[in-house]
Amino acid sequence: HGPRPYSLPDFNMLGFNYRMTDLQGAVGVVQMGKLDTFIDERANWAAYYNDQLKSIDWLELPSINTNYKRGWQSYVVLVDESKSPKSRNEIMELLQEKGISTRPGTHAVHMLNYYKELMELNDDDFSQAKLANNCSMAIPLHNRMVEEDYEYIVKMLKSL
């Protein structure tokens, strides 16, 4: 077995690392010129996912509000484990076996050891954050993917 796709790192201390190299800065400047195109491509593929995945009753899809433009840094779904064929983690492992990289959609900050100890929190203190932590799943959405990649991901999700 390889790494577990559902395992996110825990953080034991608060810290910041905002340093950027000159090379990263130069690449960033070039990328900014492509930003609108990147965002438009991601929005189109997010709409494709929403259309293609809406028939899967155990997936809660992100809403698309036409009143504003979002960046689509990721495409995060929520797995309803009361309806799904397997748990979110098992689904992520099955997708990994089929070559599809997924990750949990978010951390529940109150479940990270640093904050848990600092604020004396319990996992059940924030039920919706816990649900998002345990049941969210980010599926691939990036600008190097092609139509066949998206079709394959949809096909594999529908086959579960």
Task: Identify the role of each PLM range.
Residues H1-S74, H110-N113:
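Active-site region of PLP-dependent enzymes
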Residues K34, S82-P85:
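Short helix-loop capping/hinge motifs at secondary-structure junctions, enriched
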Residues E147-L160:
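A short beta-strand-loop micro-motif that forms or neighbors metal/cofactor-
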Residues S63-N65, Q73-K83, M111-M119, N134-E147:
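Conserved PLP-binding active-site segment of the aspartate aminotransferase-like
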Residues H1-P5, Y48, Q52-L53, E90-D125, ...:
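Conserved PLP cofactor-binding pocket of PLP-dependent enzymes
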Residues G25-V30, D51, V77, E93, ...:
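Generic alpha-helical structural context detector
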Residues F38, K86-I91, D149-Y152:
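Short amphipathic alpha-helical coupling segments at ligand-binding clamshell hinges
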